[in-house]
Every structure is written in structure tokens, then in C-alpha cells.
Amino acid sequence: MALQTDTQAWRVEIGTRGLMFSNCVPLHLPEGQYHKLRLPVSAYEALAVARYGLVGSLWEVPAVNSALQCLAAAAPCKDVKIYPSCIFQVHAPMFVTIKTSLRCLNPHDLCLCLICVGAAILDIPLLCAPRDGAGARAAEGQAAAAQGGKLRVWGRLSPSSPTSLSLAFPYAGPPPVAWYRHSINLTRSEGVGIGKDCAQDHACPVPPQGHASSAADQAGVPERGRKRAHEGPGAGEAASAGRGDVALSQSRALLWRGLGWDTGRGRLAPGLAMSRDAASGSVHLDIQVDRAEEGWVCDVLLEPGPPTAREGCSLSMDPGLVTLKDAWTLFPLHPEHDAVVPPKEEIHVMAQGHLQGGTPSLWGFTFQEAACDQWVLRPRVWTAHSPIKMTVYNCGHKPLHIGPSTRLGLALFWPAERSDNLDAGRIFYQLTSGELYWGRTVARPPTLTLPVDELRPWPKLTPEEPMQH
């Protein structure tokens, strides 16, 4: 059960880990150590062959349609170093980059395996922030009515139940039952390092207009594939009976627009509730989360009137990635400055961002060696508070121009032998700051679970498309 390519130089067959590629004829290599070899088939063609009769069960595996395809070494060879090659274009011919001092490879010296990286569900941490120009900020534990009836409240949240965080503040203004539009900003004052303690600094960072989301947003996320029933205008009032003057946020205009989560896929309903104690003149703010923990600071903007269909409530997210020990995932890595790599040479470049964390200096992690049809990325080891450096080798015949807009996809891997404690191997990468955090200090934020195939720009394989010959 094998596929002979048009050049009959490669053999494709079924292996224990996926589709196996091996050279059928001797491969003569030019001078040099690094070599880029072109396979005359694409990832789509290889998987399509499996789909159309050879390996029908392989196509049914969710990993095929929900992960980035990657060529990796199927069997070690002491004389040949094989670099894993990320396949960003499934319809383009596959490439493999090797390092060897041999001038000729005998048949079956080069054994490759087409695998799927990240064939699991990723937890995308949700961060959030209010919109710009939303009125004056109040002191911690206080509240002040701003112009136009807006109210901004901020302070440290305390767990009031296993699934809720609460803040009480004095307020003598109109009843909060009229406030429906809102933006929620949840920030950890310690741990992940995604924000400052707002109690100490009144100038907490606020993202640009049109960017806001909530770590509590996922409290109302329906299960994937199931749509939430349309809530009527009185649904919140009926659910809040017995709590006094309570206003549950209307969520009909809250739509997730990040990473393919849109109107056709579901809605987010932040669990925001307020109750007023007339005797003490205070208002209690409750935010529903999946797990209540200490260390959260909130910044909430409340506005009168329901949101319009055009305006809605602005939402955005920081699609940071969390991985654990023995797991690896992909994240974008960009050079900090423009650089030119001469043909068949390598240079050391600095990447955007830096590392944060409290792990000992002897504890580090590596990025898996990776390659594409233009460059090879050499492995490096980093520790806390160090810049991210990488070595880029130009495997082509023309100068390679790279810069801040050049995305280098890498696989982040945590060595299994470092620790048996999952917390010690936890890594969080924040995309907005380009920083990495790991170890016990990483507090995992509430998350929205998304399938890997939502991560663009890698196209989804479809058996309906014709094979390209």
C-alpha cells in the first residue's frame, strides 16, 4: 500500500505515527552541510491519497483537519540531521531541510513522517479592558457618577463563592437597574504579570477604541456547536428575583469576533450582576467566573440604556497560548529589527518580546528546531528575564530579508525531565506584549476553549477539492 510519485524518488506509505516518506533512489547532494530537498507532493495530495481509499481512517482523525501539518524525522540517522518543517501551505510542494556531511544518501536513509502538531484543543486565555474616553475613574472601593450618567468602578475583587468575584462600593446615585452597557477589565495584580495593581496606579493601560473583552466573558459561552437561545428583555430581571435592585447585563449585542468566533458560532454573555443595599447605601458588584481566585483587580464601566445594534459592546482579546509540561504549541515570533541573511549563511537576531518569570536561572526551555522553504531556525535555550535570541540560516540561493513583519512559526516545547509538577511546566505566552511566563507564578486565567483550526492562516484541508497534479 504505497504511492509512487511522478519522479519515483520518494515512497509514501502508512506508518504508526502517520504518513511515512522515504527516498527510493540515491540522493546526490552538493557541497555544504545544509540541504533543502523538495518533495514532489504536497501535504494535501498525500492526505488526499489517504482519503480516497488507501488510508480512509487517517482522514477521519480530527487532527488532520485541526492542526498544522509538519514533516518530522520518522527514524533517527546518525549521519543525517532532519529539521522539522512546518507546512504553512498545504497545496505547495513539501520541503525538508537536512544537515549532513555526506555527499550521497542511500535509499531509505531519509525517513520522514507527516504529523499534525497541536492536535488538541487549545485554551485561549481571555483578557479584557474598557473602552477609551469613558469618564472619570473612581478611587478603589469607591464609585463616582460621570457625565452623561456613566459610572466607572474599580478595585480589588474578593471571592464571594467558588464561581464569583465581588466588590462593594458606596453609591448614592440613581439605581443601577438602568445600566445595561458595560465594559469589564479584569487584571491580575500578581502572578501572570498581565497588568499593574490598579489600586497603586490610577493610569492603568487602556487598549484602543474597539478593543475590550472579559476574563469573565466565558461564563456564558455555550458548548461548541450549540447556539444560545435568544434572551428576552426580562430574562435578567426574572433570574435576579430576591436580590433587590439587580441589573444583569444584556448580552444580545455581545458577539465574539476573534479567531472565527462570530455571529454564526455563538454568543458571549458576561456574568455581571449588581445589587443595592439601601440600608448601607452600598452597591455590590458580582462577576461570574469559572473559578474564583484572589489577586484580581477589576475596572468596570457602566452606561445607561441598552446597546444599539450598530454599537453593541466592543470586544477583543489577547489570544495568548497556554501549554503544559510535555506539550508543545505554536506561537508567532517576529524579529525585532530588519536584517539580511546572505545565501548559505546564518546570523543571530533578536526577537520581539522578552521572558518573564521567577524560575531559577538553571531552568530553561528550548524551541524545537524548525525549517521552511526559506530558512532554518536553530535551537536556543533561554532563562528568565533574558532577551529572546534566535539563529536564522538562509538555505536558499538569494539574500533573505527578514524584519518585524516576518512571522517565524515555532514549536514551543517544555522538557519533560525538568519537573514532575505540572505547574512547574506551565507556560503562558501573551501576544499583545510578546512576553512568556512560566512556573508556579503563572496563574491560568479563565479561558474560552477554541479548536485549533480557528488559528489562521493555516487553511483547512477539505476532501472536496480536486487533487493538484
UniProtKB/Swiss-Prot annotation:
Disordered: annotated segments: 203-244
Similarity comment: family membership: Belongs to the epstein-barr virus LF1 family.
Protein known as: Uncharacterized LF1 protein
Gene source species: Epstein-Barr virus (strain B95-8)
